């Protein structure tokens, strides 16, 4: 999959906090960024657990100036040496997920709006991909499993 062409899709804005770094899209304001990142990266702030397995997906409500925005957070763990090396060489899975979602969106395929990725500054720390919650959506894997 090729990345979106320069200038295509939403502009990503990098951010850097004491324990976290990442990129956000213009959909997220920066005025309360530190507080929102603290909430996003705390699974205890989850409104609901969506999936618990290899990765953890949970629903949060972002507090934006225009009101609340329901978002899904996917947590990627980097516990093993292999995951840490992979993150070092290829970037975090959260960063790759954001770029893949932007590429899918740029290709005209309907996908939940990508909002951000956040990663720990610690090599073994977690990373998080954040997108808009689509309550009427479905996971593509169920569609492909039904075809098999």
Protein language model regions, located:
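Juxta-kinase regulatory segment immediately upstream of eukaryotic protein kinase catalytic domains
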Residues: 1-47
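Conserved ATP-binding subdomain of kinase catalytic cores across diverse folds
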Residues: 34-148
């Amino acid at each position: 999959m090729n990345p979106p062409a320069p200038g295509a899709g939403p502009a990503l804005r990098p951010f850097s906090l004491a324990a976290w770094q990442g990129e956000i899209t213009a959909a997220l304001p920066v005025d309360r960024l530190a507080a929102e990142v603290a909430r996003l990266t705390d699974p205890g702030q989850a409104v609901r657990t969506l999936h618990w397995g290899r990765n953890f997906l949970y629903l949060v409500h972002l507090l934006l100036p225009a009101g609340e925005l329901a978002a899904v957070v996917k947590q990627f763990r980097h516990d093993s040496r292999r995951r840490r090396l992979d993150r070092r060489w290829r970037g975090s899975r959260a960063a790759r997920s954001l770029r893949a979602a932007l590429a899918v969106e740029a290709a005209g395929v309907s996908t939940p709006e990508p909002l951000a990725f956040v990663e720990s500054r610690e090599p073994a720390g977690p990373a998080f991909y954040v997108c808009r919650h689509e309550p009427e959506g479905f996971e593509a894997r169920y569609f492909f499993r039904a075809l098999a």
